[in-house]
Amino acid sequence: MARYTGPATRKSRRLRVDLVGGDMAFERRPYPPGQAGRARIKESEYLLQLQEKQKARFIYGVMEKQFRRYYAEANRRAGKTGENLVVLLESRLDNVVYRAGLANTRRQARQLVSHGHFTVNGKAIDVPSFRVSQYDIINVREKSQKMNWFEEAQDNLVDAVVPAWLQVVPENLRILVHQLPERAQIDIPLQEQLIVEFYSK
């Protein structure tokens, strides 16, 4: 599956948001790259909408074609299209693994899922974009639990703060999906209405 593998810090600086999580290089220089990076320029409405779309894409690690499919589905659903879009993105398996504290970044979570370390309701899943549902049970596969990474993660899970819509059982390396998230429970710096306006043109 195609994915962006370029320099994350440069993208973070361009979009003015930490796309990685704990990116010290971005914190030191949170302005766009280039000699004129520090200068303030007047941004057009279109540019603001485009940047917000790109921000969402890179936060969740989604390529353009796949992002369009997410938007199309969000638009078909009842309710606010922008909020539907964010909920769909947040419901990806790789994001759930990240939110549960089993990975330090979404990129790392995507890699762990791709390598087949998880099951959902007892079935092995290696597709990062797999969409979780309410009452799903996600486990680290038994043979993967002995890996150093998961042993260390297990210790850290005891004090981990996870979203209210998830529950983590550290001793079993298990994630329970109590419900799908609501927009108010998703703490990402995103103005999704700008994305709706971008695709509505």
Swiss-Prot record:
Name the protein family: Belongs to the universal ribosomal protein uS4 family.
Q: How does it assemble?
A: Part of the 30S ribosomal subunit. Contacts protein S5. The interaction surface between S4 and S5 is involved in control of translational fidelity.
Q: Which organism is it from?
A: Corynebacterium glutamicum (strain R)
Keyword flag RNA-binding: yes
Question: Biological process GO annotation list?
Answer: ribosomal small subunit biogenesis; translation
Keyword RNA-binding in annotation: yes
Q: Which GO terms describe its cellular component?
A: small ribosomal subunit
The record, for Pfam families, names: Ribosomal_S4, S4
Q: Which GO terms describe its molecular function?
A: rRNA binding; structural constituent of ribosome
Q: In what residue span(s) does the S4 RNA-binding domain sit?
A: 91-151
Primary role: One of the primary rRNA binding proteins, it binds directly to 16S rRNA where it nucleates assembly of the body of the 30S subunit. With S5 and S12 plays an important role in translational accuracy.
Query: What are the record keywords, sorted?
Result: Ribonucleoprotein, Ribosomal protein, RNA-binding, rRNA-binding
Under the heading InterPro entries, the entry gives:
Ribosomal_uS4 (IPR022801), Ribosomal_uS4_bac-type (IPR005709), Ribosomal_uS4_CS (IPR018079), Ribosomal_uS4_N (IPR001912), S4_RNA-bd (IPR002942), S4_RNA-bd_sf (IPR036986)
Q: Output this protein's name.
A: Small ribosomal subunit protein uS4
